């Protein structure tokens, strides 16, 4: 696995960004379009961050909305277009962990959890150094 700790332009995933990004895609737009800033109503770095978070949650693949994205967010047939159901949040958390885009989540919630159920700061640092092949 190639580890990645960037791409979100320092923005956490904000409320409704996944829906906003999904709607933008199904309207046949691309995040690289010159008018993406205007159409999405956010800054240039936020456009890239929305794209990153869609990929991280497994909702975007090769600039196309994925099956799970349609299942959740489609205005007509989506199960929870506005992410109001706790089950949607569970699905999204699962997708974030199993999708290797934002590898920090997978590292902590899958790999580290497999080794230790409880841990302290030093154990986390040692784990990260070991995973990234950094000498202790």
Model-derived features: positions:
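Donor-sugar nucleotide-binding helix/loop cap in glycosyltransferases
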Residues: 1-136
């Amino acid at each position: 696995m190639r580890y990645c700790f960037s791409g979100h332009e320092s923005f956490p995933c904000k409320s409704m960004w996944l829906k906003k990004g999904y709607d933008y895609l199904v309207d046949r737009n691309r995040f690289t379009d010159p008018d993406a800033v205007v159409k999405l109503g956010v800054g240039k770095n936020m456009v890239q961050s929305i794209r990153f978070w869609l990929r991280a949650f497994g909702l975007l693949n090769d600039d196309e909305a994925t099956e799970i994205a349609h299942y959740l967010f489609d205005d007509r047939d989506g199960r929870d277009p506005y992410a109001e159901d706790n089950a949607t949040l569970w699905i999204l958390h699962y997708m974030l962990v199993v999708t290797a885009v934002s590898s920090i989540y997978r590292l902590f919630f899958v790999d580290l959890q497999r080794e230790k159920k409880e841990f302290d700061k030093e154990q986390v640092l040692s784990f990260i150094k070991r995973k990234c092949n950094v000498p202790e």
